[in-house]
């Protein structure tokens, strides 16, 4: 392990393979790095920055401050690259492979996830290093921390810059993390600044809160099941988190259900308009969120909980059926007030 970290590898021992494509499908420009990890890491970061650290958007805040949004956030890149080296299985042959285009950054490292870690618990499980000596050495050199918080920072950095969270794929032979440049949501970025000023950075800066806010930036509500899946918390932890956010005035509870929406003030600060009744398009999203969570709905249920008419609820359900997103529950009545709809 010390050899990989500090010593020069053999001439044929490639530590990193960087593949750059300016156009999808073209033959990549390959750069092979055979340096020890201490030199390979900064060299790889520079290589990624040369191709991807280009400004794709600028955001000007109300106080006049202006910031540049790069194609791939520097902190997210640092975390994904460091994790690839720190947690790879050095007993397995093969380099860390970085595939980069103008739109995506894909980092693949040999070996499975560390013991005890699964893809659906990356944010909430402290990983156990495969080799304590290697981890201790990298920690001493500032390349790793005591607790595994790399994925937290990846998630938070992508959301803070108005992008979707990374995708992670894991098998017994490799772990792959994909960052997508996308078009940054500048309204959301500016809204986060306002929310931080209003509710405090400690609240808004939490990765779980950021995940909830990113979801509510596009959907009218979030259910306990969706929140648990996206934050990787337990249902009980989600209820506790949401309770705090409701007390602070950031979220509102929906009736007596385990569902939440942005408060009127938070909606305004986030740039999603004024408080008030949900628009029809939002009600459609609300229905889809319910169906995706495995619930069955009647037109009367929708009318009771959203304030639209039963007829309008029925129209939206039929529209979702035409889109292939909803269907009548085959185990219930095919028509009438008792008709229930489920996910298609």
Regions found by a protein language model. Give the residues of each.
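C-terminal regulatory or interaction extensions
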Residues: 2-344
